[in-house]
Amino acid sequence: MTREEFKAIRKRLGFNQAELAELLGYGSAIRVSEFERATNPVAVPRLVAMLMMAMDETGWRPPTQEKE
């Protein structure tokens, strides 16, 4: 998955970088930013790419959690 594909899917899914980072279990949006950055891009892990593509194809979204 290219950085352009990753970013396009993230946007289609309606997530900002921080929201996607939380969903994927990353501590901050920095990792998602690294996946999308033009300079020194970090390879998107295969499992993350598969999850993004599955969510994009099926329209699945994680359930929202009510904040107390």
Model regions and ranges:
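Short intrinsically disordered terminal tails
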Residues: 1, 64-68
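A short, Lys/Arg-rich alpha-helix, primarily the initiator
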Residues: 1-12
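Short alpha-helical "recognition helix" segments of helix-turn-helix
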Residues: 20-22
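Core residues of bacterial helix-turn-helix
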Residues: 13, 24-25
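DNA major-groove recognition helix of helix-turn-helix/homeodomain DNA-binding modules
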Residues: 40-64
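Residues within the helices of the helix-turn-helix
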Residues: 7, 18, 33
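Recognition helix of helix-turn-helix/homeodomain-like DNA-binding domains
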Residues: 25-42
